[in-house]
Structure formats: structure tokens, C-alpha cells
Amino acid sequence: MQADFWHARWANNQIGFHLDEINPYLMRHLSRLRLQAGERILVPLCGKTLDLAWLAAQGLEVLGVELSEKAVSDFFEEHDLRPEIDQLGGFRRYRVAGITLLQGDFFALQAEHLAQCRAFYDRAALIALPPEMRERYAGHLQAVLPTRSLGLLVTIDYPQAEMAGPPFAVPDEEVRGYYAGGWRIEELERGDVLGVNWKFLERGVSWLNEAVYLLERG
């Protein structure tokens, strides 16, 4: 899956992965990240999610990373914000009070970019990637995060043979394999969500679960 794939999805407005509401799992479980006002949270592959503005409204400093320039521009335009724009290494950096978005390749992130991050929130990053990229993504995320970090991870699982992603099925054992080295993994929620996801029903998926994990690296 190349960068051109995602640029085309945004250019053609094929963004079914974008939610027009704050993610309810985030609202329920943000407190588990034990963040204080002013602390920084990373949102990888953030798109133009409404969660960015909601996190900032909770008093947090939000750092999003997104490949698509259109997604980043749309976010600020739709929130009537006028960001300061400059260059930070290989990233184009957009900044307003409480929110910084780095537009560019996630794999170009370096540890110094995340030095102030206490936690991360992944709702649409891991599940957006095919199997051959997920291990690389999880490995790079862990390599650049500070030593003591927490994470809130949302995944989906379904019979992958019944539908071509994205979003891709990420089973529990895969999550635990990616974060086996030094992370404590707690499953916070798991539930059947097929009935409220008509796109999966239309494509013949027989079951669909969503899971939420708290990750803590000690």
C-alpha cells in the first residue's frame, strides 16, 4: 500500500473511515491515560478526525501525524482555524493553540519529534495498514515513543477473507504480539458492532468486533 493510494482516497473523498462524531471509546477511556492539562498526546495517521479538537478541548497538547495535505488543510478549514505553517525536517508543520499537525510520512518520525509525548491514541492507524505494514508501523511507533508511555488503541476484527481492507482485521493475538516487549496490555472493551456498520453488512461480512486496549510501557 503506497502513499498514492491514500492521496487518491482523499482526493476522491473516499473517506468512509472518517467519523462525523467524537469517538465514544476515546471519551469513555481518555482518563485511563492519566494525562494532566498541558501534556502532549500523539495521534498517528490522524486524518481530519474530530478527536483532535476534542482532545485539545480537554486541555491537552495534541500532536497529529498525517500523510495527506488535503486532510490536514480540511481539518483546519472545517474548524475555521488559521494555522502557522513551517517546515520541521521532512514534515510540513501546522500549528494552532493546542494542536500541531505534522504532514508527511509517519515513518520519517524521529524520537525528538515525540520527546514531549506522554501517550498516544490510535483509532484508525493500525487498522488502516495491510499485514506487511502493521508490524513495521508498530515497531516504529515503539522506537520513537518516550520510554514510559501509555496508549489507547482501538481495533476491529472480522473474517479477513470476506472483505478486502482497509480497514483491516487486527485480531487480539496480533495486537499482543506487536506490543509483547515491555508493554502491559489491558483489554478495556470488546463488542459485536456488525449491526451498526452497514458497509460491512453490504459487503457480506458475517461478524465484526471492535476492541479497545490500554497499553502501558513501564
From Swiss-Prot:
**Cited SUPFAM superfamilies:** S-adenosyl-L-methionine-dependent methyltransferases
GO MF annotations in UniProt = thiopurine S-methyltransferase activity
Q: Which UniProt keywords apply?
A: Cytoplasm, Methyltransferase, S-adenosyl-L-methionine, Transferase
Does this UniProt record's set of keywords contain S-adenosyl-L-methionine?
Answer: yes
What's an example GO BP annotation here? response to metal ion
Annotated catalysed reactions: S-adenosyl-L-methionine + a thiopurine = S-adenosyl-L-homocysteine + a thiopurine S-methylether
A Pfam family matched by this chain, by name? Answer: TPMT
Matching entries from PROSITE patterns are given as: SAM_MT_TPMT
**Keyword Methyltransferase, does the record have it?**
yes
| Catalytic activity, EC | 2.1.1.67
Where is it localised? Cytoplasm
**InterPro entries listed in its UniProt record:** SAM-dependent_MTases_sf (IPR029063), Thiopur_S-MeTfrase_Se/Te_detox (IPR022474), Thiopurine_S-MeTrfase (IPR025835), TPMT (IPR008854)
GO cellular component terms given for this protein: cytoplasm
Annotated residues that bind S-adenosyl-L-methionine are located at W10, L45, E66, R123
* Family annotation (PANTHER family): THIOPURINE S-METHYLTRANSFERASE
NCBIfam families recorded: PRK13255.1 (NF009732), TMPT_Se_Te (TIGR03840)
State the family named in the UniProt similarity comment for this chain: Belongs to the class I-like SAM-binding methyltransferase superfamily. TPMT family.
- The protein in question is named Thiopurine S-methyltransferase
Q: Which organism is it from?
A: Pseudomonas aeruginosa (strain UCBPP-PA14)
